[in-house]
């Protein structure tokens, strides 16, 4: 109840009270004597009760009326709001212009659909209805009552004129799943006889609508012109033009007969109308294949009627509401049956209608299948672009990690899920379009996404393989450096157990990591073009483990060898330095003693620490002889020039020193060849001893110095004549032995020449005649007097004489003789060279000509190397480098393996321990002694005895 009504009721009660008060006052004034006041009061009370009851009844009635008014107002507001929720727009104006982006003064059909997002998601689950009929026949009014739309209706005050211009469209229904099209009237006076626009909009509605509603007045039924049967003929002809396939959807034509005549049975009207329809159908020109086709092959016909809108409005509204129920899809008797659906996707309706109207307007042959195909292609391309852009945004995360050289975790799952998700999104929308086009476009989208995934897969696998290679490099080389460093400590086989466990852990960890990465990095929908690399890396990991195990065993054996060497070295070096003839017998004894003490420790280390089986242990123990030989060899070769020094010491000890170890004093006319050859022969025996490691007693009989049968002279041979040799026991090769012997030969000749000089000095000093001494004293008398007069020169002369006397006393007179001989043998040419070097008499001496240098000639154009014109395209290097399934088995070391994998990624490593130098590195040919100069050559020429002795030496040493 409203406030105004309450106020009026209160006012009425107050007025009644005032009236009662006035009645009481009047009654008291007019009260006559003898009147019973009790009766008066009783009457008064009864009247008041009656008045109160009447007031209450009136108030209740007013309250009911007010509530009813409120309910009607609320209902009107809800209906108004509901109508406002059903938007309408003009899709085609009276000029035939479609509502697209070119029209700035009204909303486009695409924007209209975009605003109604629920409609876009319907797919095929919507229906379209259009109404045709004469102008001002109440089409818009009927639609407004049936679907609660708000189409403009006729205002009779303005006269009968065109109300609906062009084609209007409304979106209605609880789910906004019904599109209503209100078409312009067909017999308007404005267009007169121009039926082209009427035909075009009819064709347009027929191509998109599943239900055509034909509005006909009841009094026009049976009249061809008045009932607008020509429009119906157009519909039949256009339908045959559009839908000629067997599977084309039917169209429902609903005839609504308006202003029904209550006196005339509806069945009679229906039969008359149906008879006219059949006549029109028979008169329609049909293709040959449809000459005898009945009308129900293309159309379903329904008939209904409504009473007069003005004369019987309440009944009209009531029957309109009943008719409205037939447009509810939930109703079993609904007009919107699935067989009538034109199967135009909701999200592509705007584009489809635009294309259809464009073809109709330009009077082109309207091919609906082609239009649907065009729509499908356009929408699918649009979908592909949007979905692929979203796809690229989502894979940016992978690209970011790849750019930072990181492997993307769960690459396979991510790519598979993303691919399936995007394909599902595409199919959810595109499946409503033409299957053939959808399949083609789905393949295109799939190809685009798989190309991107394939590129990412290439990067992922490259990073994964490089990551595993880095793990291999870091793990194995770090471990190798550790157990190589271990070799510098005391030999303890138990320490190698930890290295073996680490290697097993590395191998299992790398294998598991690689298996995890490889299985999680290969998407399901792409071709795995890394199968070769994956299989190669699998074998490469196994091969590196084999190399690592082998190197670890070799490291243990090498450590044992160094251990043996450290034990044997103090015992072997004295034997090698003595170089006795039974040296190798003593060496074998030392080796047997040291090996037997440590062999059990090595065997336990291989079994317990390295987990080697007995066969491999037995095999390694059998190879122990090689390690012993290497230990002996290392002991000898670790001292550069060891054998050369032994030979030189042996030669000097025999040839230059006496039994007490003092330098020999040569006697006049002493024969130097005998001690020389004896010393040389003993030194040669040392070379023969160290030519071969004789760990077998049978090897003692081998000799590497033989007599040349042709010349009868000694020669060094490659292999002994009295037996075969084991190349692993050869200490020096033939070239190395020849180099050692050549150096020894030069040293021996130098010592022999020095001995010859000493012997010659003694001979010259003893053969100087007295008269020569007196002659020199006589000729030098003035100088002698000058010396005696000069205290300085006299003191210097006395000092020199004292030094010479002292040297002569202690046995170094031969040095003085050598100096004197050297001074006497200096030639004038030497004097001239000395003067020239000192810069004396520069102007008198001839200037030596400087050698002319040949200037390098400039290269001409013809001299330049001609480059090849053909440029070969370099093949992209494999991720695995040069490693293949064929050459993996040939790998023998980590260096070889990682060199083949990638030279760029190979770590730069420095050797932890310098290798022992070979003997030949320090065995350069020894030059002649510094004293053996031109003067010595002249001296030898003046002494035929010396010359003949030297010639004998050279003949004996020829090979």
Swiss-Prot record:
Residue ranges that the UniProt entry lists as topological domain Cytoplasmic: 1-767, 813-959
Pfam families: RHD3_GTPase (PF05879), Sey1_3HB (PF20428)
Superkingdom of the organism of origin: Eukaryota
Statement: the UniProt record of this protein carries the keyword Translocase: no
Top-level EC class as recorded in UniProt: hydrolase
Transmembrane segments: 768-788, 792-812
Residue ranges, annotated region (Disordered): 62-81, 849-868
Entry membrane topology: Multi-pass membrane protein
Record GO terms (molecular function): GTP binding; GTPase activity
InterPro entries to which the protein is assigned, alphabetical: G_GB1_RHD3_dom, P-loop_NTPase, RHD3/Sey1, Sey1/RHD3-like_3HB
Any coiled-coil regions, as ranges: 9-86
Ranges facing Lumenal side: 789-791
Span of domain GB1/RHD3-type G: 123-340
SUPFAM superfamilies per record: P-loop containing nucleoside triphosphate hydrolases
GO terms for biological process, alphabetical: endoplasmic reticulum membrane fusion
Matching PROSITE patterns: G_GB1_RHD3 (PS51715)
Family to which this protein belongs: Belongs to the TRAFAC class dynamin-like GTPase superfamily. GB1/RHD3 GTPase family. RHD3 subfamily.
Job description of the protein: Probable GTP-binding protein that may be involved in cell development.
Stated name of the protein: Protein SEY1 homolog 1
Source organism of this protein record: Entamoeba histolytica (strain ATCC 30459 / HM-1:IMSS / ABRM)
């Amino acid at each position: 109840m409203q406030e105004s009504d309450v106020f009026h009721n209160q006012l009425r009660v107050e007025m009644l009270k005032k009236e009662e008060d006035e009645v009481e006052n009047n009654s008291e004034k007019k009260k006559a004597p003898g009147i019973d006041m009790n009766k008066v009061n009783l009457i008064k009370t009864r009247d008041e009760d009656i008045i109160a009851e009447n007031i209450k009844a009136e108030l209740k009635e007013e309250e009911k009326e007010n509530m009813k008014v409120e309910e009607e107002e609320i209902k009107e507001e809800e209906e108004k709001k509901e109508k406002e929720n059903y938007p309408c727009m003009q899709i085609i104006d009276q000029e035939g212009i479609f509502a697209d982006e070119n029209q700035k003064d009204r909303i486009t059909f695409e924007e209209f659909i975009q605003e109604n997002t629920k409609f876009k998601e319907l797919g095929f689950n919507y229906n379209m209805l259009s109404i045709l009929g004469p102008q001002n026949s109440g089409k818009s009014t009927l639609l407004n009552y049936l679907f609660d739309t708000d189409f403009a209706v006729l205002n009779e005050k303005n006269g009968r004129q065109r109300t609906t211009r062009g084609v209007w469209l409304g979106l209605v229904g609880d789910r906004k799943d019904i599109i209503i099209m209100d078409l312009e009237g067909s017999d308007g006076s404005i267009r007169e006889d121009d039926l082209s626009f009427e035909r075009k909009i009819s064709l347009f509605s027929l191509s998109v609508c599943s239900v055509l509603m034909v509005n006909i007045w009841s009094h026009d039924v049976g009249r061809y012109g008045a009932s607008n049967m020509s429009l119906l003929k157009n519909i039949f002809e256009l339908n045959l033009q559009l839908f000629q396939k067997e599977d084309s959807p039917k169209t429902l034509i609903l005839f609504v007969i308006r202003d029904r005549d209550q006196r005339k049975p509806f069945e009679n009207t229906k039969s008359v109308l149906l008879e006219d329809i059949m006549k029109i159908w028979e008169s329609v020109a049909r293709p040959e294949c449809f000459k005898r086709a009945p009308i129900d092959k293309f159309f379903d016909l329904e008939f209904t009627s409504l009473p007069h809108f003005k004369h019987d409005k309440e009944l009209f509204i009531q029957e309109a509401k009943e008719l409205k129920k037939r447009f509810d899809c939930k109703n079993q008797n609904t007009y919107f049956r699935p067989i009538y659906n034109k199967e135009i996707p909701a999200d592509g309706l705007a584009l489809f209608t635009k294309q259809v109207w464009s073809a109709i307007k330009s009077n082109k042959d309207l091919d609906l299948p082609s239009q649907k195909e065009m729509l499908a292609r356009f929408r699918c391309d649009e979908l592909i672009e949007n979905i692929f852009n979203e796809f690229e945004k989502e894979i940016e995360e992978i690209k970011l990690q790849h750019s930072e050289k990181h492997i993307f975790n769960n690459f396979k799952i991510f790519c598979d899920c993303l691919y399936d998700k995007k394909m599902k999104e595409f199919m959810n929308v595109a499946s409503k379009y033409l299957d053939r086009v959808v399949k083609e476009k789905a393949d295109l989208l799939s190809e685009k996404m798989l190309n991107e995934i394939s590129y990412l897969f290439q990067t992922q696998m490259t990073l994964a393989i490089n990551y595993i290679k880095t793990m291999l490099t870091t793990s194995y080389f770090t471990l190798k450096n550790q157990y190589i460093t271990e070799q510098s400590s005391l030999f303890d086989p138990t320490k190698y157990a930890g290295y073996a466990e680490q290697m097993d852990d590395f191998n299992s960890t790398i294998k598991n990591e690689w298996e995890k990465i490889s299985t999680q990095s290969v998407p399901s929908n792409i071709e795995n073009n890394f199968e070769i690399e994956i299989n190669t890396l699998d074998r490469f990991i196994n091969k590196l483990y084999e190399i690592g195990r082998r190197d670890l065993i070799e490291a243990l054996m090498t450590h044992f060898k160094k251990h043996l060497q450290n034990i044997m070295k103090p015992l072997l070096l004295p034997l090698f330095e003595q170089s006795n003839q039974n040296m190798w017998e003593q060496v074998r004894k030392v080796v047997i003693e040291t090996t037997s003490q440590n062999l059990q420790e090595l065997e336990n280390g291989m079994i317990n620490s390295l987990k080697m089986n007995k066969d491999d242990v037995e095999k390694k123990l059998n190879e122990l002889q090689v390690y012993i030989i290497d230990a002996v060899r290392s002991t000898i070769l670790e001292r550069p020039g060891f054998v050369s020094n032994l030979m030189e010491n042996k030669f000097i000890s025999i040839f230059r020193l006496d039994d007490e170890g003092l330098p020999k004093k040569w006697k006049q006319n002493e024969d130097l060849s005998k001690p020389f050859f004896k010393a040389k022969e003993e030194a040669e025996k040392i070379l023969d001893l160290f030519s071969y490691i004789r760990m077998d007693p049978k090897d003692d009989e081998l000799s590497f110095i033989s007599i040349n049968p042709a010349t009868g002279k000694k020669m060094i041979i490659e292999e002994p004549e009295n037996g075969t040799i084991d190349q692993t026991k050869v200490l020096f090769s033939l070239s190395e032995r020849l180099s050692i012997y050549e150096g020894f030969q030069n040293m021996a000749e130098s010592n022999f020449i020095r001995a010859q000089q000493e012997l010659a000095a003694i001979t010259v000093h003893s053969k100087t005649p007295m008269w020569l001494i007196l002659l020199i004293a006589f000729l030098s008398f003035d100088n002698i007097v000058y010396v005696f007069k000069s205290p300085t020169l006299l003191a210097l002369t006395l000092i020199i004489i004292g030094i010479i006397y002292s040297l002569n006393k202690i046995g170094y007179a031969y040095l003085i003789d050598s100096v004197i001989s050297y001074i006497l043998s200096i030639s004038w040419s030497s004097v001239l060279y000395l003067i020239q070097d000192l810069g004396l008499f520069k102007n008198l001496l001839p200037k030596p000509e400087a050698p002319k240098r040949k200037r390098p000639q400039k290269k001409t154009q013809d001299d330049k190397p001609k480059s090849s014109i053909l440029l070969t395209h370099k093949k992209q290097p494999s991720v695995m480098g040069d490693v293949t399934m064929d050459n993996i088995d040939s790998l023998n070391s980590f260096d070889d393996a990682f060199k083949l994998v990638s030279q760029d990624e190979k770590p730069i490593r420095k050797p932890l321990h310098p290798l022992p130098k070979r003997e030949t590195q320090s065995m350069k040919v020894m030059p002649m002694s510094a004293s053996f100069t031109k003067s010595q050559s002249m001296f030898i020429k003046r002494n035929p005895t010396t010359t003949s002795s030297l010639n004998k030496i050279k003949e004996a040493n020829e090979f």
